[in-house]
């Protein structure tokens, strides 16, 4: 199964993005251990006039995530806003499931297991995690 996780960023702090990525990476590891195979692609769409992630940082992130997550970084070159940014990232996806995630979200380690389990129910078409401060 293929999961595409996408986030629109605008002027975010790199350390906050990396913290969120590490939490996501842990959730993917837990999913692999408990459930099984899941191909995960994380896409950040950058609406900032000056890109948030330089080439070296992108390379470091890809290296950090490579065992569990394919990382893609798109610079829009304009302030796309959230909805258009997500539409641009979703245009050519081959994923079975898409997850929209705010860039500052720190996932609980079993979050993906719980969300994906609910999506297996035929009467469920969409799920959303509860956010707590």
Can you say where each PLM-predicted feature lies in the sequence?
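The conserved acidic donor/metal-binding loop of glycosyltransferases
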Residues: 102-106
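N-proximal low-complexity "stem/linker" segments adjacent to membrane-targeting elements
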Residues: 1-38
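Acidic donor-binding segment of Leloir-type glycosyltransferases
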Residues: 24-74
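Glycine-rich, basic loop-to-helix element that forms the pyrophosphate-binding segment
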Residues: 75-93
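Short beta-strand segments
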Residues: 7, 42-46, 128-130
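Conserved donor NDP-sugar-binding/catalytic core segment of glycosyltransferases
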Residues: 109-133
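Short aromatic/hydrophobic "clamp" motif used to bind/position activated sugar donors
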Residues: 98
